[in-house]
Amino acid sequence: VKQMKNYRQHFDCSCYTHCVEVAFWAYWLCKKLDLDYKSAARAGLLHDLFLYDWRNSKKRLNLKKFHAFIHPQIALENASKITDLNPIEKDIILKHMWPVTFFQFPKYRESFIITIMDKLSALKSFHDYLYNSVCKKKFYRYAYLFLIGLVFRVF
């Protein structure tokens, strides 16, 4: 799992950081909702265990499909080599890309929570990247504030 620190996931976020973030928030929410928070946390840590740079590996690894469609299966295979997984954890890892993988519909509530946390983590990474790259320049700082104002209809 620590090898995930070597691979970038979204923008400046490593795969490891992304998975820890997803696992933490899924654990917290599942515990609040009295669901299987242990399975959610374990699967959250393992849901992106694919160990390759997805931006330039399609030809090198001879992948037949796009990364978004194939990495859940690769992550499940890698996670199964490390530890035994229960059915909830398997479902979470395989179906965390829903609705992109439209026919891979999540079976458990914990799977939906991981799916949502995964998308929120990606949005947070995008926001952090945008904020750090744009808001360091004075002109863009005001443009960013204006854009946020438009999005949330403050003006």
Residue ranges and their predicted role:
Residues V1-F155:
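Metal-dependent phosphohydrolase cores
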